[in-house]
Amino acid sequence: MAGHSKWANIKRQKARVDAKKGKTFTQLSRAIIVAARHGLPDPAGNFQLRTAIEKAKAAGIPNENIERAIAKGAGTYNDGEANYEEIRYEGYGAGGVAILIEALTDNRNRTAADLRSAFSKNGGNLGETGCVSWMFSHKGVVTLTGEIDEEALLEASLIGEAEGYSAIEDSDEVEVLSAVENLEHLNQTLQDAGFTVKEAELRWFPETEMNLTDEVQIQTILKMIETIEALDDVQTVTSNLAIAPAFATL
């Protein structure tokens, strides 16, 4: 029986991994579709599309799937699939933690209902557009990996008009920040300077963090974020939650 239980657990764990991988593929494919629709279907002339394709390849999405997603965005591939739109949702979690969600959906009513349920079941409230976004800033982020000469990085960052950079704890990576509209320029400048770019993306950052010390509230927030992230329509979830070191293992 012990062997059977272990096998059952392995199967459950594999199912979770497969489900997460499937959601990642869905997210990245939708991002390619939207990027191709908003600009040229050629990655050479569309930075948003180029970065979406790079993420997809890094995640192991087959080239034929990527090409199909580009064609869908360009309108040259019709399989009856609905159009996706980008929507931002905002709300509050337990303890007043601000939550910012970016989604790509073909049915905004379904997505809103799913999110409203996730919030209400975990002590939160889905709010109106703008209720928490003022607490966050939108930035371009270029992640560098490998051996990095800080003097060379400083010089390239100045040329690329970066706003700053910081090392990621317990890794060999550095994140370089810029204004949203400057991301493509910064990314190209860093590559031209010989740095290895792992990723270039837009990201939300909280202006101030909400420090919670109540273990139940922290667990509730983390559960809600996990529930929201599991929704197919959700692309990103950002909060202003700050977890004290004593609760870091929750």
Curated annotation (Swiss-Prot):
SUPFAM superfamilies the UniProt entry points to: YebC-like
Bilayer-spanning residue ranges: none
GO cellular component: cytosol
Entry annotated with the keyword Protease: no
GO MF assignments: DNA binding
Subcellular location: Cytoplasm
Predominant location: cytoplasm
InterPro entries found in the cross-reference section: Integrase-like_N, TACO1_YebC-like_2nd/3rd_dom, TACO1_YebC_N, Transcrip_reg_TACO1-like, Transcrip_reg_TACO1-like_dom3, YebC-like
Keywords: Cytoplasm, DNA-binding, Transcription, Transcription regulation
Pfam family for this entry, one: TACO1_YebC_N
A GO BP annotation: regulation of DNA-templated transcription
Record family assignment: Belongs to the TACO1 family.
NCBIfam families listed in its UniProt record: PRK00110.1, PRK12378.1, YebC/PmpR family DNA-binding transcriptional regulator
Protein name (Swiss-Prot/TrEMBL): Probable transcriptional regulatory protein SYNPCC7002_A1640
Origin species: Picosynechococcus sp. (strain ATCC 27264 / PCC 7002 / PR-6)
Lineage, broadest ranks: Bacteria, Bacillati, Cyanobacteriota, Cyanophyceae, Oscillatoriophycideae
